[in-house]
Amino acid sequence: MDKLLIEGNGPLSGEIRVSGAKNAALPIMCAALLTPEPFTLHNVPNLQDVRTMLKLLRQMGVEGTQDGHDVTLDAAAIDAPEAPYDLVKTMRASILVLGPLLARFGHARVSLPGGCGIGARPVDQHIKGLQQMGAEIVIEHGYIEAKLADGAKRLHGARIVTDMVTVTGTENLLMAAVLADGETVLENAAREPEVTDLANLLVKMGARIDGIGTDRLVVQGVEALRGAEHTVIADRIEAGTFLCAVAAAGGDVTLRGVPPGILDAVLDKLREAGVTLTMGDDWIRVQMHGRPKAVSFRTSEYPAFPTDMQAQFMMLNCIAEGAALVTETIFENRFMHVQELNRLGANIITEGNTAAVTGVEQLSGATVMATDLRASASLVIAGLVAQGETLVDRIYHLDRGYDCIEDKLSAVGAKIRRIQG
């Protein structure tokens, strides 16, 4: 099992190009199932989850290739509209094939999902919405079995109000709705930039969607969609991770290929912490000297502070002047990094969904274990500032969501290298 060996060595300097967003690329790849025509994507990150999704689509009969950051997909000949457990268990986004398969082929069999162990993240909102659109769904032996009602040729439009804001639920129902008969209204829809990117791609394919970027999406179903070419948006969480790394280690780094507008909540908190930020249309320059100030924050749905940045920003508070409260409202069980950060000398106490962080002047290197994707990133940042060497174990979590993180950090002066396991 691979590990990362990191030596804390002071400020970072240079440029980093931000990769495409995994959380946009995966649903967009699933959208290829909606059309028999070819489909080309650019700026796709080179990640394990992308490779897993490609493998899943190929298993269904999709012709798919990846060349660097370009992916081509052709779903003209689907012979197995099924997502088996052995692939779905490693990646929750596999559930996103359910809506497209049901909409285009009228039936689907999808294993209940796996992925990071950071809470239940149920799929009941997906199922409830599809049932309102006329799907008959049963769950047997760990699989979601979905089909159209007897005699129905298509899903039908419906007004769907989800009980909570759900990103993958919005994406699944949106992809189902674009081929449904009639009008579908998605109330309480997720507004994340990745959802907007998917919606913009669907419009290129011929979908009729109003309200893109709002919490109310109105979809007029069409009979067929065409192929498309699309460039995936920048990964705002990767960008935020590098911003926190520079804020912690100090230095002067420019991030390229990322529009600042998708990161407003994180940028506001970084300014509160004392970070100097300058920016243009698709770049952000981050400058930091001295210790950050402790900043309290609360995670919530976009456009508020993202749960996927909670661990990284908590790490910044670990070495800050003062104390701060971190409140996690999206997922239960998302403080698994706390124990590992405390092993490095951090002072964090948790109670329920809140962590009280008191900043310390210095962390000390140690062997730590990654428990999920974003927890892994917080441990890498900790290693950049800790005295001595830090060994981060189980970094397969990191490889699921970060494209060459050690190479990008090395290029700006970090002492970090992968040890093959």
UniProtKB/Swiss-Prot annotation:
Compartments, as annotated in UniProt: Cytoplasm
Keyword Hydrolase attributed: no
Family, as annotated: Belongs to the EPSP synthase family. MurA subfamily.
GO biological process: cell division; cell wall organization; peptidoglycan biosynthetic process; regulation of cell shape; UDP-N-acetylgalactosamine biosynthetic process
UniProt-annotated binding residues for UDP-N-acetyl-alpha-D-glucosamine: 92, 121-125, 308, 330
Residues with 2-(S-cysteinyl)pyruvic acid O-phosphothioketal modification: 116
Biological function: Cell wall formation. Adds enolpyruvyl to UDP-N-acetylglucosamine.
Pathways per UniProt: Cell wall biogenesis; peptidoglycan biosynthesis
CDD domains according to UniProt: UdpNAET (cd01555)
GO CC field: cytoplasm
UniProt catalytic activity: phosphoenolpyruvate + UDP-N-acetyl-alpha-D-glucosamine = UDP-N-acetyl-3-O-(1-carboxyvinyl)-alpha-D-glucosamine + phosphate
Enzyme class: transferase
Protein name: UDP-N-acetylglucosamine 1-carboxyvinyltransferase
Principal location class: cytoplasm
EC code(s) of this entry: 2.5.1.7
Protein's UniProt keywords contain Isomerase: no
Keyword annotations from UniProtKB, A to Z: Cell cycle, Cell division, Cell shape, Cell wall biogenesis/degradation, Cytoplasm, Peptidoglycan synthesis, Pyruvate, Transferase
List of residues binding phosphoenolpyruvate: 22-23
Stored Gene3D superfamilies: Enolpyruvate transferase domain
Catalytic residues of the enzyme: 116
A molecular-function term among this protein's GO annotations: UDP-N-acetylglucosamine 1-carboxyvinyltransferase activity
